[in-house]
């Protein structure tokens, strides 16, 4: 079974060309994952790991030295030198009318080791993040004031009353 071949056809999720909830796929998932392993449908709106928003900066991505897609950011902020983002936890980012709280640095997991094009794993990537960045790269964030963000919007780092409730 090619686990990476997951797509939708007419609204149905397929695994290797078969319906995700078919007995054949269930048997293969259990064979790969062990007794009791199964796929489940999740219709929830939230699809995130730690917090709803993962922000990276171009400076940190350049320091990382690999394809930025390995970090899985929702938002990349340009014009940031080096690892300046490491000083941002506890503050907020104002992007147009949007206000984003910066909670903390993201502790990276094994997903960074997978090439986004080939899905080939290179554990040296994740090991390098732990060695060079204490395992943390990019920012766990959440939206305080919603709205639309567009490419080219100015980003301002904000502290104080506007960021009440953001842990330092």
Language-model segments: residues:
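Metal-cofactor-dependent catalytic cores
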Residues: 1-168
């Amino acid at each position: 079974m090619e686990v990476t071949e997951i797509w939708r056809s007419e609204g149905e999720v397929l695994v290797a060309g078969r319906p995700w909830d078919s007995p054949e796929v269930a048997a293969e998932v259990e064979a790969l994952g062990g007794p009791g392993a199964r796929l489940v449908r999740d219709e929830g709106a939230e699809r995130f790991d730690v917090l709803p928003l993962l922000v990276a900066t171009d400076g940190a991505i350049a320091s990382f030295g690999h394809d930025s897609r390995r970090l899985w950011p929702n938002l990349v902020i340009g014009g940031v030198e080096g690892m300046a983002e490491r000083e941002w936890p506890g503050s907020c980012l104002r992007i147009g009318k949007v206000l984003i709280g910066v909670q903390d640095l993201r502790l990276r997991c094994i997903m960074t080791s997978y090439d986004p094009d080939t899905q080939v794993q290179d554990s040296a990537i994740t090991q390098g993040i732990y060695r060079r960045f204490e395992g943390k790269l990019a920012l766990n964030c959440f939206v305080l004031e919603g709205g639309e963000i567009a490419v080219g919007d100015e980003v301002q780092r904000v502290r104080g009353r506007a960021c009440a409730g953001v842990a330092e």
